Amino acid sequence: LDDSSPDTWDSEALRPFWDAIYKMNLPIYFTLIGGRGSKIYERSWMDSYLAEQKVLLGWLNRYPGLNVVVTHGLPWTAYLENGQINFPEEIWDIFKSPNCHLQILIPIQMGARWEYPWKESEPIIKKAVERIGANRIIWGTDMPMVARFCTYKQALDQFRVHCDFLSDAERKDIVGGTASRVMGITN
């Protein structure tokens, strides 16, 4: 599909591709940006993002059992109000699917606004853990792009050292355990 196509990535034209992925039981990583090409500007980023989540929810219902990861986190900056991230309730709907995971990498979106260790992000990270579960959250680096805001170690230490509300088991899930399970990697 190109930007001029009215079809979305879940269209009938792509059904054979998705059916093959489903048969192979491969994990899928989706980056939701709230539209493609000129469609991005047809409505607000917030509305477009939620609409794209609904497309993903339909896809998840069509292909149950596949592990899916929403990459790059949620649209943190779109919902930033007075220094706090305030998501609407419906942003959590796709995570009602037990196989939908969330990759979190705060520095790439918020590094220009907040300083390490990004304490301002902790309330929304805590909420994500409460709503989704650490066993469905994956730490992401976005290296080398994130290096303009922090080191690799700092990005990792956000979850290894900071976020005091996390248990040791939750930390292990977020910084590797969840990704290992999604990818089918066993020790």
PLM region descriptions:
Residues 1:
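A metal-dependent hydrolase metal-coordination microenvironment
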Residues 4-138:
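Catalytic pocket-lining loop regions of alpha/beta-barrel enzymes
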Residues 54, 86, 121-123, 143, ...:
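Generic preference for well-ordered secondary structure
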Residues 75-77, 144, 181:
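Residue-level detector of flexible, active-site-proximal loop/helix-junction positions
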Residues 108-109, 143-146:
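Short Gly/Pro-enriched loop/turn and capping motifs at secondary-structure junctions
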